[in-house]
């Protein structure tokens, strides 16, 4: 399957702001895709200030299907980053991005500062949950990868 880097950035997305960073996510990001796997995208956007201060602020997470995407507004991204969310931490360490504004590199340069005890707890919790799924005969991936 050929990857279209900005295929997920469609009109139906209603992103009221500008894209800061995006990457392929899921099985394709780890080269574990199967022949029928779909391509997932994730990213970070910065909402327009007038929208943030308005009566109808934009969503903190935008999602969609065909193609599958999940994109966080930068405040939500930072909240998840400070909680040590593994998928969010991974964004700072990947070299496999498909869109990246220069401002992203400032955050990326500080990425080691976000590797805290909380991140270790999050990764260990995820690993334990995956082992429990295996013990109960459930797949570790819900769809799309090996």
Residue ranges and their predicted role:
Residues 26-28, 50-53, 72-75:
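Flexible, active-site-adjacent loop/turn segments at secondary-structure boundaries
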Residues 4, 9, 48-49, 85, ...:
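Alpha-helix initiation/capping motif
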Residues 22-24, 41, 77:
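Generic structural hydrophobic/aromatic packing signal, biased to beta-strands
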């Amino acid at each position: 399957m050929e990857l279209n880097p900005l295929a997920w950035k469609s009109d139906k997305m209603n992103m009221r702001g500008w894209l800061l960073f995006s990457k392929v996510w899921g099985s394709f990001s780890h080269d574990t895709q199967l022949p029928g796997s779909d391509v997932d995208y994730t990213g970070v956007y910065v909402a327009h200030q007038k929208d943030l201060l308005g009566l109808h602020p934009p969503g903190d997470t935008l999602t969609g299907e065909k193609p599958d995407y999940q994109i966080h507004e930068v405040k939500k991204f930072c909240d998840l980053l400070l909680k040590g969310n593994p998928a969010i931490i991974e964004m700072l360490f990947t070299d496999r991005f498909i869109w990246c504004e220069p401002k992203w590199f400032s955050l990326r340069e500080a990425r080691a500062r976000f590797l805290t005890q909380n991140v270790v707890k999050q990764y260990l919790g995820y690993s334990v949950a995956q082992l429990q799924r295996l013990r109960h005969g459930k797949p570790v991936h819900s769809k799309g990868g090996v």
